């Protein structure tokens, strides 16, 4: 089924509704590839600026769909936060999972660009891909610390029922209840990692990231100086 895109005018009219009716001035665009249509996204930013809408907003997108012109225009329109999927540092793991990724040097450059514009960044990472090992997961955690985004979120690779990828994992699924599909609980028998291994890596990822002095200094101490 072909997706149906809303017009920029329709989006701006809804923003105006929330501003005038309820005094809302902060928004999240719940579209995982918000800027995939560069021209349309640029025109939306320009329309928000033209209408003088005093708002702040968050987007989610792939770093590949951002450049300086578009990012700076979105920032001018009110973008202050971006969620982007980094997923893994291991290109072989991403290839096996059929996940597209930028070259790591380009990824670093895009995040530095956003940081330079004053946009806060959330990096999203996945542990426990089918070909992941303990070593590849630890490398991803270290890479996340190197990128040092404002927020990092780590989750377990989860093939959800009803998705195409679920079919290839169907014979290995161990989850018996839908509530187990929560991106924290491993739901299939992994060849390289036990369920306890994956849970331990996930806990270590959060502890290692948020107790890291580099992150703590950037996000807390510098704001007090």
Name each model feature, range by range.
Residues 1-122, 129, 142:
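Radical SAM [4Fe-4S] cluster-binding motif and immediate context
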Residues 138, 142-154, 158-225:
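C-terminal accessory regions of radical SAM enzymes
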Residues 124-125, 154:
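A short glycine-rich, hydrophobically flanked beta-strand micro-motif that places a catalytic Asp/Glu
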Residues 8, 38, 134, 194-199:
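Generic detection of long, well-ordered alpha-helical segments
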Residues 31, 124, 183-185:
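Short, solvent-exposed beta-strand edge segments and adjacent coil->beta transition regions
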Residues 131-137:
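Active-site glycine- and acidic-residue-rich loops that bind
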């Amino acid at each position: 089924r072909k997706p149906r895109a809303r017009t920029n005018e329709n989006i701006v009219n809804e923003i105006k509704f929330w501003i005038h009716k309820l005094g809302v001035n902060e928004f999240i665009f719940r579209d995982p590839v918000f800027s995939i249509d560069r021209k349309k996204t640029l025109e939306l930013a320009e329309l928000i600026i033209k209408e003088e809408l005093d708002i702040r907003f968050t987007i989610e997108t792939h770093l590949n769909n951002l450049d300086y012109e578009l990012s700076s225009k979105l920032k001018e329109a009110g973008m202050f936060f971006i969620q982007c999927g980094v997923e893994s540092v291991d290109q072989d793991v991403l290839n096996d999972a059929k996940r597209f990724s930028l070259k790591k040097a380009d990824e670093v450059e895009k995040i530095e660009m956003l940081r330079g514009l004053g946009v806060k960044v959330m990096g999203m990472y996945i542990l426990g891909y089918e070909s992941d090992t303990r070593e590849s997961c630890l490398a991803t955690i270290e890479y996340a610390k190197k990128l040092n985004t404002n927020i990092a979120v780590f989750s377990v690779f989860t093939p959800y029922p009803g998705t195409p990828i679920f079919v290839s994992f169907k014979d290995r699924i161990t989850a018996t209840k839908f509530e187990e599909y929560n991106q924290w609980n491993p739901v299939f028998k992994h060849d390289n990692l036990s369920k306890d291994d994956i849970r331990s890596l996930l806990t270590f990822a959060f502890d290692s990231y948020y107790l890291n002095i580099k992150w703590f200094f950037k996000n807390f101490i510098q704001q007090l100086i």
